Amino acid sequence: ARSAAAGAARGAGAASAAGADDNEPAGTVPAAATFGEHLAVPGTLELADGRVLSARILPVEHGFDVVSYATAHSQEWLGESVLLDAQACGVDPVHGGSLWVSGPEAGDTMQPLGMHGQSKKISDLLGEAGVPVESRSMMPIVRTNIRGHVVWVAGIRPDERVKCTQDTKQLLELNIYSGHKPFERSQ
């Protein structure tokens, strides 16, 4: 099954990487990211292809089953929205903060959720998700900071290290959507 983000990347013909080599072997990523900006938490960031990334913090009430809720949320939104542990992402629940959003860089790895701490190359993850090679440089990669670890390959997969646990006190909700804010769903 291909994710909605992969579909958006395929449909964004104008969002092809500037200078991307069509002869580049499958599964490779350009040597450097083609964009990079801070995403304020809470806040939104408009991407060059017209999609928008948003971030907000949600409190967790005592006794709430945050793990089940985060899992159900992810399944309902088909990867376009994810709930993560705000503290694990380096975001202060009171003062907020920022995350770094850029394209993938050569050699990028992450620990995809569900792989129990095993690392995987971002280029491999994008290939498995069906993202065309020419669109991969524009895929938003959300990191803790400029040199920090990956927390979410937007629309594809979060990182194991930032997943919600029963100890999660504040949720970080990240969304990616096209052009207009999605409707709010009741909780």
Tell where the protein language model's regions lie, with residue ranges.
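AMP-forming adenylation/ATP pyrophosphatase catalytic core
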Residues: A1-Q187
